[in-house]
Amino acid sequence: MVQQLALFSAIEDESYPLSVETLTILSSNRPRLFANFNKIYKPNPSLQIEKVNAKNQLVEQTRVKLSTAVPLSKLGNGAELNYHFMEKLSNDDIESFNVKSYIQDIDSNNKTNWAFQISDIPAAGNNRKLSSQTIHESVIQSSSGSVSSFIDELGYVNDFQYINVGVKFQFLSGVVMEIYKVWQVVQKDQEVSMKLITKDGFMIKAMYNVNKSTDIESLNNGSQLLLKLKTDLRDYIELDIPDRKCMDTRLNHLD
């Protein structure tokens, strides 16, 4: 479990090169390209699930997320890629990426590593300067069958899925910053298609993870680091807190 402090923003496509250059200088590290395939599941509505715990308290059902890294070789047909690759991604399809073949491969491979994640809605408060969210995560290294059958046994069914591709900056202070695009992945019968959600721009996330929510010193340190970064970037990127409802994983939200 981690307590994640975060700030968010968005930039237009034209601002990407300058943003990368600025963050490379601030972080003292070159950007690292990443890609993740994410599957969101919700509790199976056909199952009768208790909505109260042992203390007779109401428990709201939440979505869970499975994520796995997409090999960069899959994105570029084996070619070596760097941060400039992101400048070519402005369409619904990633030309060099066969999403249907990729999904078939990972669905049939029970050795694929998946991150299994459950997250709470960020803490409320009118005077908050940062988003603060509790995230529970475990790693599934293998399963006896496909990941779909594994998640089905847990009582969950598919809700939606997406791919995010971007660059990541690791600051010496422990702050991590990501600039990325998001594609919704739609499966209908035997067909698989992608739809670019972040058209004409990029999402940005700056985060700092603390292992224990009771570690006040680390939480204060992370808060100071993120707020300083916000000040340093004020002429380039407007980091802010999103509406906490857009990060709400509870089942009744967005239904």
From Swiss-Prot:
The keyword Transcription applies. Keywords: Activator, Nucleus, Transcription, Transcription regulation. Pfam families: Med18. It is found in: Nucleus. GO terms for molecular function: transcription coregulator activity. It comes from the Eukaryota. InterPro entries: Mediator_Med18. GO terms for cellular component: core mediator complex; mediator complex. One of its GO terms (biological process) is termination of RNA polymerase II transcription. Component of the Mediator complex. Belongs to the Mediator complex subunit 18 family. Component of the Mediator complex, a coactivator involved in the regulated transcription of nearly all RNA polymerase II-dependent genes. Mediator functions as a bridge to convey information from gene-specific regulatory proteins to the basal RNA polymerase II transcription machinery. Mediator is recruited to promoters by direct interactions with regulatory proteins and serves as a scaffold for the assembly of a functional preinitiation complex with RNA polymerase II and the general transcription factors. This is Mediator of RNA polymerase II transcription subunit 18. It comes from Kluyveromyces lactis (strain ATCC 8585 / CBS 2359 / DSM 70799 / NBRC 1267 / NRRL Y-1140 / WM37) (Yeast).
